[in-house]
Amino acid sequence: MTNIRKSHPLFQNLNDSLIDLPAPSSISSWWNFGSLLGICLAIQILTGLFLAMHYTSDTTTAFQSVTHICRDVNYGWILRYLHANGASMFFICLFLHVGRGLYYGSYIYKETWNVGVILLFAVMATAFMGYVLPWGQMSFWGATVITNLLSAIPYIGTNLVKWIWGGFSVDKATLTRFFAFHFVLPFIISALFLVHLLFLHETGWNNPTGIPSDSDMIPFDPYYTIKDMLGALAMVLALLMVVLFSPDVLGDPDNYIPANPLNTPPHIKPEWYFLFAYAILRSIPNKLGGVLALVLSILILILMPLLHTSKQRSMMFRPLSQCMFWLLVADLLTLTWIGGQPVEHPFIIIGQLASILYFLLILVLMPITSIVENHLLKW
């Protein structure tokens, strides 16, 4: 008799995706982050669901409802901090996942890559709207500044901003709709996640060498289930360390001050995971130019398959391209640091140079380096 997991229509897909899935024998720990992102999403949906039971999306009570969750609800404090720091863990895994894709040439699978870029945008939108919900000073002013950027769109900009706000400023209508979108978007992300997996299983997995591994496959279970469980254990341990020992280390102290439209904080900045894009936005003196650069800093990932000029897929055997890749990583870390600094000398010029280098590396230097390597290898 056939095993039920192989014959039952409900379990068949799960079996083909998680148990009998053929996987390359050479994939390293850099391939763990896909499963970690799935776990992060599950943590965020579960903690978010329980937080939503106690949260009120009204400007007069939102801040108090978050305080109530932390003080009066049973284990409300751990739910709140798991959710807030879980978002940071989500983005750490996300950036490492994208970085691995860039390093090992995973973007050659165009459909999987493009769905991944859409997922990145969806997660960023969800995180931004979630940051507005506690209705602290940084929530309010962050929402005001970022939504105001849409007014840079010619002709329709001003009306578009008022339409998103639901009035003439960020107020009750804005908070209510942001809560609604923040609640529904994770489920849309879950659907996109399944589409991402669907395309991945159509093509099969890449591996560190970038060479097709059809002749050397092993079943996903037990080898990679154990490996993923170890990664998940390490991630949950790191998350709990932050939540239980220093839950506010990644937050902004200004967000413990209730939102006040009459008092602007001295330095408005988003959460740490948006700082690199925020630094690029600020480095351009023109409003529309800054907004375009902000969008392109993420959208540029769509162009990666077109910018791939190397005859090899992976960077594993390409030392010059590796130098360029790590220069890009260093540049992004510099941008993250600059995004958290005030707009004054010397941070302005450092941010501008780092922004130019970011686009220069991706659009010019990395493709040229790949062509040089092809010639050096006489390909």
UniProtKB/Swiss-Prot annotation:
Membrane topology classification: Multi-pass membrane protein
Miscellaneous: Heme 1 (or BL or b562) is low-potential and absorbs at about 562 nm, and heme 2 (or BH or b566) is high-potential and absorbs at about 566 nm.
Keywords: Electron transport, Heme, Iron, Membrane, Metal-binding, Mitochondrion, Mitochondrion inner membrane, Respiratory chain, Transmembrane, Transmembrane helix, Transport, Ubiquinone
Gene3D superfamilies the UniProt entry points to: Cytochrome Bc1 Complex, Chain C (1.20.810.10)
Gene Ontology molecular functions: metal ion binding; ubiquinol-cytochrome-c reductase activity
Naturally occurring in which organism (per UniProt): Pteropus speciosus
Gene name as annotated: MT-CYB
Source taxon at top rank: Eukaryota
Record bears the keyword Ubl conjugation: no
UniProt-annotated binding residues for a ubiquinone: H201
Function per UniProt: Component of the ubiquinol-cytochrome c reductase complex (complex III or cytochrome b-c1 complex) that is part of the mitochondrial respiratory chain. The b-c1 complex mediates electron transfer from ubiquinol to cytochrome c. Contributes to the generation of a proton gradient across the mitochondrial membrane that is then used for ATP synthesis.
Protein name (Swiss-Prot/TrEMBL): Cytochrome b
Gene Ontology cellular component list: mitochondrial inner membrane; respiratory chain complex III
